[in-house]
């Protein structure tokens, strides 16, 4: 996630701050209903109650998940201590895996230093707002999911109209599936992504803003 100047006038603009930096997409300010309704299939209790959240300023989010190519360049230049494994699935344009929350934060700080722009992890609210891209369904592409839409555990069906699909059991290169309405790829599937927030089971009962809770236990989201 990168801060966008307040005078930005073209939400959706795609840019890259440096040849080694991720390609970014501007996301406009707005508001949305965060969380999932109580009757949504396969939801977790911590996804509710739904509540309206305002995103007060535009920001930018990576067009794709950070790739091994991008993270390996960071490793060569900054040496964070260890080189994350690719689980023998390949590196290159696949999303980087086996990185901790702290690794991700250090990478963002390095990007900030090298590019002169502010990078950080998105809050959970910013991430969900960007993922939904104006939709209210379980997925930004509708009520169900298939392996033609995302790389996920396709050996189970989702929703009334869902079907058993392909389960690839490994990551694939980024950008292999259709983007959402904001031009972001792989917002569902392929890898889990880190957010700035700490995990808190009853967070939705306590908080209703965009700012991260930095008190609870660290957990991927």
Role assignments for model-derived ranges:
Residues 14-82, 99-102, 188-189, 196:
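A short glycine-rich, aromatic-capped structural motif
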Residues 4-6, 60-64, 97, 142:
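Alpha-helical interaction segments
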Residues 1-17:
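N-terminal pre-domain segments of enzymes
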Residues 33, 37-43, 81, 85-221:
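Functional-site microenvironments in short loops/helix caps that host divalent-cation chemistry
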Residues 7, 56-58, 213, 218:
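Compositionally biased, intrinsically disordered low-complexity segments
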Residues 2-4, 24, 119:
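Short glycine-aromatic motifs
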Residues 2-3, 57, 123:
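Generic detector of low-complexity/intrinsically disordered segments
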Residues 11, 23, 28, 49, ...:
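Cysteine-rich, disulfide-stabilized extracellular repeat modules
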């Amino acid at each position: 996630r990168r801060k966008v100047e307040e005078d930005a006038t073209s939400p959706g603009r795609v840019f890259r701050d440096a040849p080694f930096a991720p390609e970014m997409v501007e996301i406009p300010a707005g508001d949305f209903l965060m969380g999932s309704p109580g009757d949504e299939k396969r939801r977790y209790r911590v996804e509710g109650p739904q509540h309206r959240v305002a995103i007060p300023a535009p920001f930018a989010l990576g067009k794709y998940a950070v790739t091994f190519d991008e993270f390996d360049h960071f490793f060569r230049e900054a040496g964070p201590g260890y080189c994350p494994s690719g689980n023998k699935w390949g590196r290159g344009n696949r999303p980087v895996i086996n990185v901790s929350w702290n690794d991700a934060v250090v990478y963002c700080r390095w990007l900030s230093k090298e590019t002169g722009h502010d990078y950080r992890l998105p809050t959970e609210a910013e991430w969900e707002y960007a993922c939904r891209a104006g939709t209210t369904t379980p997925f930004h592409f509708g009520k169900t999911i298939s392996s033609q839409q995302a790389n996920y555990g396709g050996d189970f069906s989702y929703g009334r109209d869902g079907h058993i699909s392909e389960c690839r059991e490994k990551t694939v290169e980024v950008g292999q599936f259709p983007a959402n309405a904001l031009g972001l790829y792989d917002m569902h599937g392929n890898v889990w992504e880190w957010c700035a927030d700490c995990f808190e089971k009853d967070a939705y009962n306590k908080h209703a803003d965009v700012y991260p809770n930095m008190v609870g236990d660290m957990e991927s989201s």
